[in-house]
Amino acid sequence: MSETTKSGSKKSGQTSRRAIHSCLACRRKKLKCDHGRPCSNCLKRSTIQSCIYIDPGKTNYDKRFERGSEADELIDQLLSRVSMLEKRLNEVGTKSQSDYENQQSHNLPSTPSADAETQRNIGSLSVLDDTKSQYANYSSSSHVLWHLRNYHYLNLDQDIQEENDSLISPFFFRISPNESAYDYLPPKKVSDILIEQFFFRCHMLINVLHRPTFYVRYNDFWEKPHLRKPAFTSLLYAIYASALLATPVEVQKTWALGEDERYLQVDYHQAFRYALASSNFLFEPDLNALQALVLCQVVFDSDRIRAPPSLVGLILHVALCMGLHRDGSLYGLNPVISEIRRRVWANIVLSDLRTSETIGYPPQIVEGNYDTRLPSALPDEIHNVDSSVIISEATFVNIITKVSRAYSKCLKVLLGIIAPNYTRLLELDRELSNFFKELIEVNIPTSNTMHERHIRLLVSYLSNRFPILLHFPFLLKKNSAQFAYSHSRALESATLALNQLYELGSNPEYSKYSWYLWRYPPFHPCIVLLLDLLNSQKIIYLDDERVVLLNKIFSLFPRSSGKEHYQKAWALLQTSRAKVWEKLGLSTVDVSTTDVRLTNFEFFDANNLDINWDDWDAIFQHCPF
């Protein structure tokens, strides 16, 4: 009786109330929805604007959906409105998109569209603004919490009380209560000069910025001081410090700043650290702060043995948390922000590769774990600045990214737990040689401009350095069957690399970029020549081609650097050369880099190292470059 009463109390035609989890588009087409934001079905049909979810927590929606016919009518109305909006957006966006595609450089390769790869594990990207984002993959706890918080309206943070003081306190550096990061800020006149020098000397080699976007924020920084943010301030200080390091002192004197010249002596690297700490970077990652950290890591911290692994590891994990390993176009980010993220990621991949080469463990960034596209030039950059310069900058970062990806595969095999056999090493050597040959022919077919000649020469220099690393372990095994070929191959590559390095450093045409070369000394090529001289059965004279070449390289170094930030490798190289010259009975009077000059330049004192200078294996262990 009770059962009959209960069933009879229901209104005829009334269905049980059920939460609607599928998007409206999938529900209408009766498709299985994966509840993504957007779902895979809407991604596949390129109708992500139609991927609408109804809030299950609001009763007025539930009451409407108790009656099926009204629900269908509501869905039809919503979808018709969305379709109309999509049509208008497509009409407006088609022309601008075609303009972007038509103005892309013909030198840059086309990349596949995001729509063609909709089967990827997309995950979720929360974008707070152009500089702050957070990535979470499916099945991760972060994604589950993100989903509950954003789509089920559960305020999971309401019971978590955080003390602001603990978050604001600097993690990296302690700032005096009487000091502020803004105390280091130069006048705008000086700032403008340093910004100009940065784009002239550094931007092509460390391309992490988009000029038009940067200048918009830069002008706001000076015109609206009340809106200044520590993250962007840290980026400015990183740019100032990089520009001063890359600009010769004699050029700085021509600026005629008068009393403002004192701002050229400010430690902007330290100011960058203060601003980075003030930005609360670890707890609130920001793209501007990440750009600043990448800049300073390349320009300043590459001269340290232990700093790169920890700093690059920090940079890498912050970038992963921000989702830079996923291409922004997959999440509907605008082309400019997506391109900035690609450039930053490209430099992080390169830093990871350099750290791997320095320390000797496999690269942490492995192909297949990221889908960020190759960087390229944007039309607004080409329009506002000399197009040849922009194309060259985009070509360089594009090529270096390709080189990093190819070389990363090689280092993964070379530095793995199981050492590859000699046959595999020879295969890697051939693969890299063919890769570089094709890369130059396809991407830099001509040498008509200074930038094209410079990029061709720089890529050729890199291509001749890589085989040395492959054959280096066999150079100390004189009695092995592999010694003869490895010695010949390494010697050939070292000679070519050093000759190309000398041209890069001595040709006035490339002088504005020479500072970058000395951040990564040619340790391996120089040691290969020194070993060859020691193993020679003939009497060596000062006019020997190998001796002349080594002296030429060292003659460039003091003239090209002129800063306090030197690397341990240069001191080891100088001392190694002096010991070899002494052993061969060669005069060191004409050697450009003497011990006296080293002291003036504040080099690391390699003479105090407890090293047997006849034990080359020990030298390698002390300097991994």
Swiss-Prot record:
Q: Coiled coil located at which positions?
A: none
One Pfam family, short name: Fungal_trans
Compartments in which it is found: Nucleus; Cytoplasm, Cytoskeleton, Spindle
Q: InterPro entries this protein is in?
A: Sec_Metabolite_Reg, Transcription_factor_dom_fun, Zn2-C6_fun-type_DNA-bd_sf, Zn2Cys6_DnaBD
Q: Which GO terms describe its molecular function?
A: DNA-binding transcription activator activity, RNA polymerase II-specific; RNA polymerase II cis-regulatory region sequence-specific DNA binding; zinc ion binding
DNA-binding positions are 23-51
Region Disordered, annotated ranges:
93-119
Query: Which CDD domains does this UniProt record tie to the protein?
Result: fungal_TF_MHR, GAL4
A single Gene Ontology biological process assigned to it is: positive regulation of pyrimidine-containing compound salvage
Matching entries from SUPFAM superfamilies are given as: Zn2/Cys6 DNA-binding domain
Record keywords, A-Z: Cytoplasm, Cytoskeleton, DNA-binding, Metal-binding, Nucleus, Transcription, Transcription regulation, Zinc
Statement: the UniProt record of this protein carries the keyword Amino-acid biosynthesis: no
Q: Which GO terms describe its cellular component?
A: chromatin; cytoplasm; mitotic spindle; nucleus
Enumerate composition-biased segments (Polar residues).
93-113
Query: What PANTHER family has UniProt attached to this entry?
Result: UNCHARACTERIZED TRANSCRIPTIONAL REGULATORY PROTEIN, ZN(II)2CYS6 TRANSCRIPTION FACTOR (EUROFUNG)
Q: What is the name listed in the Swiss-Prot or TrEMBL entry for this protein?
A: Uncharacterized transcriptional regulatory protein C139.03
In the record, what lineage is assigned to the organism producing the protein?
Eukaryota, Fungi, Dikarya, Ascomycota, Taphrinomycotina
